[in-house]
């Protein structure tokens, strides 16, 4: 088998530009991000996520993010049928960490912005200023229909109008502690939130449609996007370029943070064998549900996160970019990511989170030029 990661052929940028941020996408739902009967099967718990984030902090990860999922895909694996709640989980994790940045996700159809503003200010206090909010509009209709709060299918074409008003209320309340915002979706009447966050609250998003990127260009501190393909670490470059161009139109610097799964082992062949094993156990019933739901939004264009998730090419891990190889191969591929214009960080998942973070910290990260600035490890973590 050929080396999964070809030798780098580019000239690395200067050291400052190569200081790429790394985060962990914690498994708030059962089984993480592998829709396979052959993958590790586990329930989400606070203790599991605590161990993951504390390991990530020990190995100098920069941030941890949790999603929000309100209904799963079913199938033999009951994929994502079992989920914790994002804000309460991250509040708990904020209390048991000291350096790593913590981000929770707000499903904006379920939570009024004034409540999110107050919850965020509370976790800012718990964390000592290490908290931020990921805003999502909602794409999986059954999540909201089951609670009677789906606003109708025209929401697909208006969701970023809704989110624009939402974030304006948040900015009012975090900035001055007061909002009198009047819009089509929200009406504030001397709405108050105090105490306010101790530092400016970071807002992040994950838009790949034109509307999503335009929103991020105006309001987000950075924007998540999917990596693409297997061992094609720079295939997301056109998406990062679109985000960079959108941000230039608003005069802001909004970097792209790219989602990848790492499947690593001592050799390329051993890592590839794991990947093929996971694919062979794909939960077809759960994948069919994902495909069906991804087709409900016909108004956001073809280049969206949801469309990519359902692509049959690598649906077993929701088509996030996948880096499969030896520790050295994965390190080289991540250095390639760092060289893409507009790429400022990566958000990583693992086939096995606890062992994956440990091997990443011990065997992969020390080989990465874009992480050469990190201090040496000083202690063991349980």
Swiss-Prot record:
Cross-referenced InterPro entries: Luciferase-like_dom, Luciferase-like_sf, Pyrimidine_monooxygenase_RutA, SsuD_RutA_monooxygenase
Domain of life from the UniProt record: Bacteria
Signal peptide span: none
Annotated FMN binding sites: 68-69, 134, 143, 159-160, 209
SUPFAM superfamilies: Bacterial luciferase-like
Induction behaviour: Up-regulated by the nitrogen regulatory protein C (NtrC also called GlnG) and repressed by RutR.
Reaction equation(s) it catalyzes: uracil + FMNH2 + NADH + O2 = (Z)-3-ureidoacrylate + FMN + NAD(+) + H2O + H(+); thymine + FMNH2 + NADH + O2 = (Z)-2-methylureidoacrylate + FMN + NAD(+) + H2O + H(+)
Keyword Cell division: no
Keywords: Flavoprotein, FMN, Monooxygenase, NADP, Oxidoreductase
Enzyme nomenclature, EC number: 1.14.99.46
Single biological process term from Gene Ontology: alkanesulfonate catabolic process
GO molecular function ontology, one term from the record: alkanesulfonate monooxygenase activity
Leading EC class: oxidoreductase
Chain's role: The FMN-N(5)-oxide reacts spontaneously with NADH to produce FMN. Requires the flavin reductase RutF to regenerate FMN in vivo.
Family membership: Belongs to the NtaA/SnaA/DszA monooxygenase family. RutA subfamily.
Entry protein name: Pyrimidine monooxygenase RutA
Species name: Escherichia coli O150:H5 (strain SE15)
Gene name for this UniProt entry: rutA
């Amino acid at each position: 088998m050929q080396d999964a990661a070809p030798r780098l052929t580019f000239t690395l940028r200067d050291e400052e530009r190569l200081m790429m941020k790394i985060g962990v996408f914690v498994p708030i739902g059962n089984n993480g991000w592998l829709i396979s009967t052959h993958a590790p099967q586990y329930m989400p718990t606070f203790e599991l996520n605590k161990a993951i984030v504390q390991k990530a902090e020990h190995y100098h990860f920069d941030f941890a993010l949790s999603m929000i999922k309100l209904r799963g895909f079913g199938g033999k694996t009951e994929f994502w049928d079992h989920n914790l709640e994002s804000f309460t989980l991250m509040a708990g994790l904020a209390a048991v960490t000291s350096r790593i940045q913590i981000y929770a996700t707000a499903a904006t159809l379920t939570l009024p912005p004034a409540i999110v503003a107050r919850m965020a200010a509370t976790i800012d206090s718990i964390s000592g200023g290490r908290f931020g909010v990921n805003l999502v509009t909602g794409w999986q209709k059954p999540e909201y229909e089951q609670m009677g709060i789906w606003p109708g299918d025209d929401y697909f074409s208006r969701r970023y109008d809704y989110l624009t008003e939402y974030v304006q209320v948040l900015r009012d309340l975090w900035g001055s502690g007061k909002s009198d915002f009047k819009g089509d979706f929200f009406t504030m009447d001397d709405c108050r939130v105090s105490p306010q966050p101790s530092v400016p609250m970071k807002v992040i998003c994950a838009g790949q449609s034109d509307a999503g990127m335009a929103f991020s260009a105006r309001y987000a501190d950075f924007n998540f996007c999917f990596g693409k393909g297997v061992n094609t670490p720079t295939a997301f470059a056109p998406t990062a370029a679109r985000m960079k161009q959108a941000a230039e139109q608003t005069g802001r610097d909004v970097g792209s943070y790219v989602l990848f799964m790492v499947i690593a082992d001592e050799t390329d062949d051993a890592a590839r064998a794991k990947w093929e094993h996971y694919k062979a156990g794909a939960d077809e019933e759960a994948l069919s549900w994902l495909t069906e739901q991804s087709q409900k939004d016909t108004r956001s264009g073809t280049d969206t996160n949801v469309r990519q998730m359902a692509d049959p090419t690598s649906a077993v891990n929701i088509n996030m970019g996948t880096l499969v190889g030896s520790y050295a191969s994965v390190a080289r591929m991540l250095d390639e990511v760092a060289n893409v214009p507009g790429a400022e960080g990566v958000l990583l998942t693992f086939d096995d989170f606890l062992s994956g973070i440990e091997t990443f910290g011990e065997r992969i990260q020390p080989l990465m030029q874009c992480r050469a600035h990190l201090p040496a490890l000083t202690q063991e973590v349980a």
